[in-house]
Regions:
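C-terminal motif of bacterial Sec signal peptides marking the signal peptidase cleavage site
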Residues: 18-21
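A short glycine-rich, aromatic-capped structural motif
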Residues: 53-148, 159-182, 350, 534-535, ...
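Functional-site microenvironments in short loops/helix caps that host divalent-cation chemistry
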Residues: 26-42, 63-64, 70, 75, ...
């Protein structure tokens, strides 16, 4: 074999190998890996988004890459609460607000409700009034806080201070509203809604993300003109010779997941910010606070001695000596006044404590679940009309709830899907759940009590947590006028823990340094508010658990 023949054989072998490798690594960006069909919609078949990269970060949020960590207190327990024993836990990647929700952010919500549901109209008065924070939380029988009561929420001097006086229920309603306003603007910006659609303040036709996905043609009360933006006008298909308008679907990747309260596990994981202690696939050491070190003061030269959070430093000492204030605040302080933690989150220790989503129990049971732990699931399903379509709440059927405190709040707004508990069809032959309300699952329900095997009547009487049963009800007088009566349970009680008690995390301006440890936990009734509890939102991460691009490996 001469040299030329050998070279020809080499070239043929290389080309054949190249063609074989190309054949084995087909590009399925525009064709189905299962059928080979076109998936761009050009051939008249189904279309799927093929250029989607990753979830965009919503307004105000920062990305938190999930992982495993030790949840609970890893130091001594001088209070002997024994409610945060350490467990190994994993949380999925998620997003969290960079700061606490501020007065200005919450006022934007109140103004929207005020314009959309004018409180001057008796029918809607409770909508706005039920969302307003309780400013009376600033009162103290032996303190002079009248100025804070009158100015803290609305004065521009406090615009970037964390909102307080908000119940857990109000925080959840704000989260739903924020979800809808963010997605509404995204669709408008991308041409799926008419420009300015978000300023539609017709009280009977509000945009709701979940309702849009289930019944898009009924959004805005069926006002089709608002649903046809520059881009959505092109979303049509021909069915039986009729041109049908197409709407944004989940598969298009346009809509963001809901804003919500973070779970306790997410909040603690994010507050710890363990990335600074990571070495390869392990953590070297522990963290007592969201920052490195065992002290609450900065050791850096430029601000040495300054406190790294806003908290009560001792009896009668909320900020230090005048002219040398170590934390710069008597009560709450402006957001971003202190350095962020490793994830870029501000005020995860101090300023205000924060509501999280979980129902409180005195333990986190790793044996029941060690991934994305959350106590408080209440499964619901969409309520359907007789024709099988989803039932939407309209301005005549706004849902209100009278809390134990006597306050009336709106829990179902026009444009939202009416919800109901899951029925037996969804529970039948299920191995992973068997009820709608799981707040007391494994700790507080009948199945976890020693009376479980006794008579049903006895089961109904027994409660693992002997918490008060207060109620509010209406009584008609001789003229038929309804008056509110409050039934206060004054019996002997052993605990305030119930299915309506929520976890509160983090320290506040009113707490000492003990509560700055992210592992500390306490509880507060979900329908009550105080001047030291605020909140921030979180959002699920869909798709990859890490950001695209280079991942550090050291």
């Amino acid at each position: 074999m001469n040299v030329k023949t050998a070279l020809k054989l080499i070239v043929v072998t290389v080309v054949a190998g190249f063609m074989t490798s190309c054949n084995n690594s087909r590009n399925y960006d525009k064709t189905s890996r299962g059928t080979g069909w076109d998936i761009t919609g050009k051939d008249g078949g189904p279309s799927y988004r093929t250029d989607y990269k990753e979830q965009e970060t919503g307004p105000g949020l920062v990305f938190i890459e999930g992982g495993t960590f030790t949840m609970g207190k890893v130091a001594d327990d001088p209070m002997l609460d024994w409610n945060n024993t350490p467990v190994q836990m994993t949380v999925n990647s998620f997003y969290m607000d960079e700061t606490e929700v501020t007065n200005n952010m919450y006022l934007e919500y109140l103004d929207y409700l005020k314009y959309t549901f004018p409180p001057s109209d008796e029918k809607y008065a409770a909508v706005y009034e039920g969302a307003v924070p309780d400013t009376l939380v600033w009162r103290d029988p032996l303190g002079d806080h009248q100025t804070l009561l009158e100015t803290y929420l609305r004065h521009p001097a406090y615009r970037d201070y964390p909102v307080v006086g908000v119940t857990w229920i109000q925080a959840n309603e704000y989260s739903k509203w924020r979800t809808n306003r963010v997605n509404e603007k995204r669709m408008e910006d991308q041409g799926y809604l008419v420009e300015g659609a978000r300023f539609n303040h017709d009280h009977g036709s509000q945009f709701d993300t979940e309702a849009y996905l289930a019944a898009p043609s009924q959004t805005y009360g069926g006002n089709d003109s608002l649903l046809k933006g520059k881009k959505s006008n092109k979303l049509t298909e021909v069915i039986n010779n009729d041109t049908v308008h197409k709407y944004v679907q989940q598969k298009d990747g346009v809509l963001l997941p809901p804003y919500r309260l973070p779970t306790e596990a997410e909040w603690e994981y994010a507050a710890m910010g363990m990335s600074s202690t990571r070495e390869y696939n392990n953590y070297r050491g522990r963290k007592k606070y969201p920052w490195d070190g065992s002290y609450t003061v900065s050791g850096k030269r430029k601000n040495r001695g300054d406190q790294l959070a806003n908290f009560k430093q001792g009896y009668g000492d909320y900020s230090g000596v005048a002219g040398w204030s170590s934390d710069g605040a008597m009560v709450t302080n402006e957001i971003k006044s202190y350095p962020p933690n490793d994830y870029g989150l501000y005020d995860m220790a101090g300023n205000v404590a924060e509501w999280v989503a979980d129902v409180y129990r005195d333990r986190v049971d790793m044996k029941l679940n060690d991934f994305n732990y959350f106590r408080g699931n209440q499964y619901t399903q969409n309520s359907l009309n007789e024709d099988g379509s989803v039932e939407l709440i309209d301005y005549e059927s706004i849902e209100f709830d009278t809390l134990r405190t006597g306050r009336v709040v709106a829990t179902g707004m026009p444009g939202e899907i009416k919800k109901e508990e899951i029925d037996d069809d969804q529970i039948f032959m299920r191995m992973n759940f068997d009820r709608s309300d799981n707040r007391g699952y494994g700790d507080g329900d009948k199945a976890s009590s020693r009376f479980y095997m006794q008579e049903e009547e006895l089961n109904e009487q027994q409660r693992m947590y002997n918490s008060p049963r207060n109620s509010v009800y209406a009584v008609a007088d001789s003229l038929g006028n309804l008056e509110m009566e409050k039934d206060v349970d004054d019996g002997n009680r052993t605990t305030l823990i119930s299915d309506n008690t929520r976890v509160v995390k983090g320290g506040s301006w009113k707490d000492n340094a003990y509560w700055l440890d992210p592992a500390q936990r306490r509880f507060y009734p979900e329908d009550m508010a105080t001047n030291w509890i605020g909140f921030r939102n979180a959002m699920d991460r869909v798709g990859s658990g890490s950001k695209k691009g280079h991942r550090p490996r050291d």
